[in-house]
């Protein structure tokens, strides 16, 4: 297993480095603007199911507004279910990504700088990449920042910030991550591996419905003869309702396994250093033009 994780780390680090760095050139987004051009900074979220989740989203949005105070700000959600919930409750109309792009085009915008609140390179993030690539025919420049966990430095900085904010010295700290599918699991396995490489003693990663799983977590806890567990939501836009539901389910299973459980009430959105990493990714997207698959294909001819 150790050999497998080592190879996984190397493979993921290499793939990330190639996709995020080598296939790009330095070209400041706003330097490409000409008379008559219009720019917007765009925040993309899955959505919010309660007031707390909306506050978490607003912290992210406030970061974008502060970082680019003279640029128009826009927001879109990717979950139609959450959009409909807000609309049904009288919260107004929030556009999907496609709807927002269409409206921005009608309003004469030519340059878009986009950052999502995705933690990992999830299916939702992959769909957003596809939508951005499709919109490149519509706008003069459209740039997309990377998710929170992109290269190995991100992993290390996120773990350092999370440990400083929520770590417990008297209990085993468990990062509660959202369930993933297929190859997405590798990103949380990598997170768990870096915890061990960086010598974060008594720190663990588990996902709801993915890997590392709760059952694999319990095996690790037994090996280290852990008695107390501190659950830490490794979430960003989730509100108290969703976080509490996940934590309650996990706590029950761990208690049945014989552990005393405490739960952190906050998540990653309350950590300033985490917000800063998102901003750094957006700044990078502003400064560098990333080649599309079509552009890369043309370059190899």
Model region roles, listed by residue range:
Residues 16-20:
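Sec/Tat signal peptide C-region and signal peptidase I cleavage site
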Residues 4-14:
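Sec-dependent N-terminal signal peptides
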Residues 21-301:
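Active-site-proximal alpha-helix that buttresses catalytic centers in soluble enzyme cores
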């Amino acid at each position: 297993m150790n050999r497998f994780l080592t190879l996984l780390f190397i493979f993921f680090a290499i793939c990330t480095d190639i996709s995020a760095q080598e296939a790009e050139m330095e070209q400041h987004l706003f330097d490409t603007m000409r008379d008559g051009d219009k720019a917007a900074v765009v925040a993309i979220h899955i959505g919010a199911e309660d007031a707390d989740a909306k506050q978490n989203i607003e912290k992210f949005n406030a970061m974008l507004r502060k970082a680019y105070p003279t640029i128009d700000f826009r927001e879109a959600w990717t979950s139609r279910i959450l959009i409909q919930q807000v609309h049904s409750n009288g919260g107004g109309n929030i556009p999907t990504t496609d709807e927002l792009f269409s409206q921005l085009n009608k309003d004469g915008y030519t340059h878009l700088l986009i950052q999502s609140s995705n933690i990992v390179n999830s299916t939702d993030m992959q769909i957003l990449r596809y939508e951005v690539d499709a919109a490149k025919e519509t706008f003069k420049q459209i740039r997309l920042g990377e998710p929170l966990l992109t290269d190995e430095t991100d992993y290390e900085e996120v773990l350092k910030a999370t440990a400083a904010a929520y770590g417990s010295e008297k209990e085993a700290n468990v990062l509660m991550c959202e369930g993933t599918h297929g190859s997405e699991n590798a990103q949380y396995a990598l997170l768990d591996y870096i915890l061990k490489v960086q010598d974060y003693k008594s720190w663990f990663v588990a996902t709801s419905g993915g890997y590392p799983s709760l059952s694999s977590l319990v095996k690790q806890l037994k090996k280290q003869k852990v008695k107390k567990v501190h659950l830490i939501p490794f979430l960003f836009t989730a509100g108290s309702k969703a976080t509490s539901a996940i934590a309650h389910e996990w706590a029950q299973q761990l208690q049945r396994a014989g552990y005393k459980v405490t739960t952190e009430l906050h998540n990653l959105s309350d950590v300033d250093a985490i917000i800063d990493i998102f901003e750094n990714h957006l700044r990078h997207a502003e400064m560098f033009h990333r080649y599309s698959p079509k552009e890369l294909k043309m370059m190899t001819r």
